[in-house]
Amino acid sequence: METIGFMKNIETFAFPKQETVAMDDRAAASNFLGQPPVGGPPVKDLSALKRPASEMVKSHVGLFSPVKRRRHCGHSSVSDLARSASCVRSLAMKAKNTWMSNVPVMSSTHLVKRECPPVQGADLSDNLATASSPAHTGKGYTPFEDICLKQLLEVSRHKLFRSLEEVRGSDVRHDSRCDVPRAVRCRSLPSRMTPEKNSAEVSIGGLKDQSPSTSIRSNLVSSLLGVSRRDDQETSDSCHDDDDDRAINDSERYDVSECDESGPPTPSSGFIDIEADTPPCSPLNLTTTGGDSVSQLFHSSGHGVGDRQRNTASTDAKSSHIKSKSEDATKDKLGPCCCCGTTCSGGTCKEKKTNFSIDAILRPDFGSGNFLGQDGHTFQPNEDHQTVSSAQTTPRFSSPDSAFKVVDLRTRSRSESLSSPSSSSSSSRSSPSPPLTSPVSLRQKWERQTGSFMRRHLKGQEHFNFPQSLFPNPSKDLENFIGRDFPFISPPQGNPLVKFPNIFPDQLSHLHPAMPAECVDPRTFYYAPENFLSKGQQPLLSYDMSKLFGRSLHPFLNSPPKPQPQKRPGHHLAPTPVEGVTLKSVGTNHNPKVLPEVKTPVQSPQGDQKKRSRDESASKGKQVADQNVHLKENSQKSDPVLKQEKGNRKVSPAGASPETDKAKNPLWPAWVFCTRYSDRPSSGPRSRKPKRSKAQDEKRPRTAFTNDQLQRLKREFDECRYLTETRRKNLADELGLTESQIKIWFQNKRAKIKKSVGVRNPLALQLMEQGLYNHSTIKEMMEEGMYPHTPSQAGDDSS
């Protein structure tokens, strides 16, 4: 039957109750799946190639399987299970004594959970046992043709790095529900995202130091491939041997306190419990004593099966053959113990070494023949391990080279501080494969790329700078902010010209003060307005780009500030007019306002004519000015009032500044403040028509107010001296008077108060002084001696 190893390209196919599963050629070439199990649910409308693959995918789906993670079914009570490697150390429960539990737990616990797959038909261990039978001795196959120890170790290292990456962001805390005081519970991100109702519990119990039983051996494939998934109806079909699990003594259970020798049981201690992460029968668990017997079982005959197993024997025969082989291997095979170096019967050892530090796991010689244990003893596997080789595969244990380098997990690079073998040892040679590091982040990939994309597609982003208050150090804080939150928009670059490809030269000194102007490439500047090329101009605010846009970007400014005169070096040195100044010296002067007077001995006839016209106009202007002065003096002599005013004025000393005169004289003339047009001097004196004398009968009688009306008007006047329209209407209705009568009474009342107080309007007094007051009150003021003009003079001045 064709197996999954024949798939060369990526192929998608559907299987029951799942959406889509994709397999790539790299995972298929590793051939971890072996032969698909039999007895599963029937698959319809699938080819001979896809049918075994879909059945195998349904039984073995996990983090490290060749199958991509797929969408889990909502109706299933078992989820697609959080990653088994997400916790460096799982919770040790005394109530459980098996490696994995197949019963789905419908509880509200937050433990990291996974499930063991049901073993149906032939698995990888069955294939190995069948391949070691005499029926296949002449086939020429080699055990584990494609699954060598280096590949298994590579999977283990990937598992280790994924665990460490996820433990960094996990919640590590004490679990009060556990009896063991040092038990630590880790909740990683996948475990938080996994629904509680769709999960199965994993518990680590004590493991007996003996040959692997059928239940433990059945988990071999699941430990290599990750964690599988099953439905509810398949839970009852599990092939775990519960009797063997119950036979394990409580005194021999795994105890967390054993880890105290190597380090505290926390993920940050730097120690990985391989036994807590892989089954004891797995070849990945190199520290388990039972693993040696399993390895001897794998390589006992010297012949094996490859990726194409064509045996047609029944499943029952294979299972029985496996049991017999395992019992024989347990009784007959005795090898040196990896812990104490002595021969231990039954694969047991007094000192049980289950932990390796991260430094030891990352050593290049880890897993090789010369690997040194944690206590310094050399781990020497059996001779069968070193001599097994064939033309198709490379030796697994005899190769001194390793596919792994010492890697510092904090810096993600090689670290000399980590323990590594000396350069003289044969195991310290260069590795044939690249060193194993954690996945490179997107930001690191972006930093390695060139800035051509920025120069071509992200032009103009230099105008949108953040305020300096948010980022005190723009060259670093802005890069960190954008690189952390928007890695694909503006990645941090070391060259400022890459970040600001077409910025203006005068702004570069403000954005990057340390950048010299000589580094600017003029070919990258496509537009630079004329008034922005001055290097001496300072920006209005920090990182203000309003000048670049030609408008103000700050709404709180009503109008943009006026441009200051351009300052250049040497502007304070005003040139002095020197004889024989040439045009060249005039061009070098930077101050256009102060120019030296150029004197040339030879002048053209046109220049003479212009000079004559200028002289004539100047002489005419001087004559007109002299005439005005004479007229003014004559008018002052003829006018005695003006003489008196001139005599009353105080003559300011010659050294008095004009500012004092401005303080005394008002800025605006008084007539500007006149509210009536007739008060202005342009209107002239007010002309009044002569009124004809009226007879006694034609005179309008004065309004006789009653006592009540007068008292009410006085009260209203005391409250407010000015009437509003509504108030005037209400008073007219209440008192039985007209609105005009009430308005006139209020006006008369205000005039009497002003006259009795004797305080005159300062504006009127100022107008009277200037001879601009045209009312008849001038006569009264002149009679009282308050106005200096006579009535005739006032009329003459006003005219």
Swiss-Prot record:
Classification via Gene3D superfamilies: Homeodomain-like (1.10.10.60)
Q: Which CDD domains match?
A: homeodomain (cd00086)
Please list the residue ranges the record marks as binding DNA.
698-757
GO biological process: any one?
neuron differentiation
Q: Does the keyword Amino-acid biosynthesis apply?
A: no
Give me the ranges of the annotated region Disordered: 189-331, 369-444, 554-664, 678-705
Which residue ranges have biased composition labelled Polar residues?
A: 210-222, 284-299, 377-401
Chief subcellular location: nucleus
Q: Which family does it belong to?
A: Belongs to the engrailed homeobox family.
- The protein's name in its UniProt record: Homeobox protein engrailed
Q: Which organism is it from?
A: Lymnaea stagnalis (Great pond snail)
